[in-house]
């Protein structure tokens, strides 16, 4: 009988929310770099790739065409069966439609589901309005996407339990 006591899932965020090439010259910025880094992570044992994209200057963005290119490049490699997890980032006051659209079009296996709002370090507000959380939860159910429930403080635990119901 298999037990979960000896099972592990390695998830990588090769670009992450904030790192830049100034922070680390190896941070993948362009879709080709991101896809290559995901493939190398899969070869090393990663099962999930949490995808963020950057604009041409290397700043975090939610540009659908960038997401589409990254996903297409990863899925074009037929030997790589890594599960894709697209961020639904709440940084920068993004429109709810813009945050959900990549999920509808690209159908990843997972997406981030950040269970509340918070101050992000000293430079941004990470906003996840209850209206958005409800809409995202329904979209996950309708699209068959598993939410990666992210909890950054104890209050978010209660939000997660509320939306799971």
Q: How does the language model describe each region?
A:
Residues 22, 47-70, 120:
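Glycine-rich, proline-tolerant flexible connector loops at the mouths of alpha/beta enzymes
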Residues 1-26, 112-119:
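N-terminal small/glycine-rich loop or linker at the start of catalytic domains
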Residues 10-14, 49-51, 82-88, 109-113, ...:
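Hydrophobic faces of well-ordered beta-strands that scaffold small-molecule active sites
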């Amino acid at each position: 009988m298999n037990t979960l006591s000896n099972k592990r899932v390695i998830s990588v965020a090769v670009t992450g929310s904030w790192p830049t090439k100034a922070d680390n010259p190896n941070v993948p910025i362009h879709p080709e770099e991101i896809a290559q880094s995901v493939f190398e992570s899969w070869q090393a044992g990663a099962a999930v790739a949490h995808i963020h994209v950057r604009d041409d200057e290397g700043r975090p963005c939610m540009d659908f065409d960038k997401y589409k290119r990254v996903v297409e490049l990863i899925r074009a490699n037929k030997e790589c069966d890594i599960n894709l997890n697209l961020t639904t980032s709440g940084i920068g006051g993004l429109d709810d439609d813009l945050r959900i659209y990549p999920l509808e079009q690209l159908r990843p296996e997972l997406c981030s589901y950040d269970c509340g709002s918070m101050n992000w370090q000293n430079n941004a507000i990470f906003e996840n309005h209850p209206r958005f959380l409800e809409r995202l939860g329904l979209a996950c159910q309708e699209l068959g996407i598993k939410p990666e429930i992210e909890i950054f403080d104890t209050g978010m635990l209660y939000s997660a339990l509320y939306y799971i119901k």
